[in-house]
């Protein structure tokens, strides 16, 4: 989750108990974009799943971040919009215009790709200026077979009562099962906005702040498991600038993958960036097709 290249270590965010709506200058966003791009390039990955990528938004000074990443990585991308509003009227000063979404990047041959709508968590009129959550499906043909590698990039609900995440998680599970029954290889990855069963390394300091729910192995269809790591938190609370340690700054593990059992998980790890350029840290996954 790139945090639209505006939520680096010195930033906070009003929805998490901070006060800011956007960085003080365009230079901050440009520095973060360069830093995020360098981190991505250093991984030399076949596929990148990015969330919170702005196309045209006041909060990131109207920089087209999709174009930036494509140029920086010299790689093609597929985009699915999940936030498009001409004017978000809250708080003061307001968020203003937002157009943003999910980005899956690869140089492999893509057979097809599509946006899959997820359940909405909010009713009218709030939903008119809120995210429209979705999954971004990308299908890669497997040479010499009739199977496909199905990649699903997602960003589940954050600030609802929990019901939205449950509905969205069920829709994701149904999609996983459908593809597995078709004999495909499946990797779903992104920002769950939930932590994972058995992952409790980073203690919650303040239950009055944002506390993620938990997603359980039993929530997954047969043939799937989580691929997550807790060697470092994947996200921090934006109630203030990053302190440099997890005793004073709240950390969570809420980003990771779901992988079908016809894929061997060789390695999964959090790339510890010290939250230099965004409020999330990337999770690297290496698999082998079986």
Residue ranges, per PLM feature:
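Active-site-proximal beta-strand elements of phosphoester/diester hydrolases
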Residues: 1-22, 114-116, 137, 147-158
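Metal-dependent phosphoesterases centered on the DNase I-like endonuclease/exonuclease/phosphatase
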Residues: 160-261
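Active-site beta-strand/loop signature of hydrolases that rely on acidic residues for catalysis
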Residues: 1-2, 32-62, 105, 138, ...
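A well-ordered secondary-structure block
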Residues: 86-149, 153
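Conserved beta strand-loop-helix elements of the APE1-like EEP
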Residues: 71-73, 97-113, 139-141, 248-264, ...
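N-terminal, active-site-proximal structural segment of metallo-dependent hydrolase catalytic domains
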Residues: 1-71, 75, 79-90, 94-99, ...
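Surface-exposed cleft-lining segments at the edges of enzyme active sites
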Residues: 19-25, 53-55, 119-127, 154-163
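Solvent-exposed loop/turn segments at secondary-structure junctions
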Residues: 4-5, 54-57, 82-87, 110-111, ...
């Amino acid at each position: 989750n790139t945090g639209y290249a505006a939520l680096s270590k010195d930033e906070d965010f009003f929805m998490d108990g901070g006060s800011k709506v956007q960085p003080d200058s365009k230079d901050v966003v440009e520095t973060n974009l360069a830093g995020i791009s360098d981190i991505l390039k250093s991984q030399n990955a076949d596929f990148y799943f990015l969330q919170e990528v702005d196309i045209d938004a006041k909060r990131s000074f109207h920089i087209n971040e999709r174009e930036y990443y494509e140029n920086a990585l010299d790689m093609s991308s597929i985009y699915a919009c999940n936030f498009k509003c001409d004017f978000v009227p809250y708080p003061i000063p307001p968020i203003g215009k937002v157009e943003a979404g999910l980005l899956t990047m690869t140089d492999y041959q893509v057979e097809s790709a599509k946006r899959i709508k997820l359940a909405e968590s909010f009713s009218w009129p709030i939903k008119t200026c809120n995210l429209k959550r979705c999954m971004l499906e990308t299908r890669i043909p497997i040479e010499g077979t009739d199977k496909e590698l199905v990649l699903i990039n997602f960003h589940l609900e954050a600030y609802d009562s929990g019901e939205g995440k449950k509905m969205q998680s069920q829709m994701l599970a149904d999609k996983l099962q459908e593809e597995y029954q078709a004999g495909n290889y499946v990797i779903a990855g992104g920002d769950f906005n939930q932590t994972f069963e058995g992952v409790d390394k980073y203690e919650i300091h303040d239950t009055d702040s944002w506390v993620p729910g938990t997603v359980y192995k039993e929530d997954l269809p047969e043939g799937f498991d989580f691929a997550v790591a807790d060697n470092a938190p994947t996200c921090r609370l934006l109630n203030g600038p990053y302190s440099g340690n997890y005793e004073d700054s709240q950390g969570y593990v809420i980003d990771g993958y779901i992988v079908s059992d016809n894929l061997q998980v060789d390695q999964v790890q959090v790339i510890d960036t010290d939250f230099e350029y965004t409020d999330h840290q990337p999770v690297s996954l290496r698999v082998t097709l079986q």
